[in-house]
Amino acid sequence: MSVNFVDSCRLPTHLGEFEMYGFVEESGQEHIMLTYGEITPDKPLLIRLHSECLTGDSLFSMRCDCGYQLETALENIVDAGQGALLYLRQEGRGIGLINKIKAYHLQDDGADTVEANEQLGFAADLRRYTMCKPMLEHFRVNKVKLLTNNPKKVQALKDLGIEVVEQMPIQVGRNQYNHEYLNTKAERMGHMMTHGLLSDLG
């Protein structure tokens, strides 16, 4: 896959100052990578692969855990003194924003997150991670510590020839609105959920 680096800039945030790098696929799809600290290629890099979630990341939705995970991942990277966030433009697990709204409507009517996708004619998860290899290669990184609950992300990187030396769960944001969503991700999509995430809210 051809993924080209375009440009970079400083990105000051309330957590600290990151460097933001822009990448574009041949298809025109854009992705960004935020780095913090000095990237040393011979050292496993703490990273998060985060797929775009407008509702969670920008609109503070409590229907998912995405926004909570984004914030926590950046905090962990800053605390570690070094790391990167790959922000991938594949909204709604790859089905797009409008279809995500349709899926949410179906969930309002009783479907779970997997059933909603299937009723719309989609697989439960259409995301891909092939763009991550050239993005990481831009920094000569081939060993990572991955912040994720999703074993498919671990396997995807391994399939790309990237060594995942550690999977670090990022279990945050459980609330009354996303409790069943998190249950479904654990039970039907294989996500790691512990610390009472599967217990009843009390």
Curated annotation (Swiss-Prot):
CDD domains: GTP_cyclohydro2. It catalyses: GTP + 4 H2O = 2,5-diamino-6-hydroxy-4-(5-phosphoribosylamino)-pyrimidine + formate + 2 phosphate + 3 H(+). One of its GO terms (molecular function) is GTP cyclohydrolase II activity. It is an enzyme of class 3 (hydrolase). Its cofactor is Zn(2+). Belongs to the GTP cyclohydrolase II family. The active site is at D125 (proton acceptor), R127 (nucleophile). InterPro entries: GTP_cyclohydro_II (IPR032677), RibA (IPR000926), RibA-like_sf (IPR036144). It comes from Colwellia psychrerythraea (strain 34H / ATCC BAA-681). Zn(2+) binds at C53, C64, C66. SUPFAM superfamilies: RibA-like. Binds 1 zinc ion per subunit. PANTHER family: 3,4-DIHYDROXY-2-BUTANONE 4-PHOSPHATE SYNTHASE, GTP CYCLOHYDROLASE II-RELATED. Catalyzes the conversion of GTP to 2,5-diamino-6-ribosylamino-4(3H)-pyrimidinone 5'-phosphate (DARP), formate and pyrophosphate. Keywords: GTP-binding, Hydrolase, Metal-binding, Nucleotide-binding, Riboflavin biosynthesis, Zinc. Coiled coil: none annotated. Pathway: Cofactor biosynthesis; riboflavin biosynthesis; 5-amino-6-(D-ribitylamino)uracil from GTP: step 1/4. This is GTP cyclohydrolase-2. GTP binds at R48, L49, H50, S51, E52, Q69, E91, G92, R93, T113, T148, K153. GO terms for cellular component: cytosol. The keyword Lipoprotein does not apply. The gene is ribA. It comes from the Bacteria. Gene3D superfamilies: GTP cyclohydrolase II. GO terms for biological process: riboflavin biosynthetic process. The keyword Nucleotide-binding applies. Its EC number is 3.5.4.25.
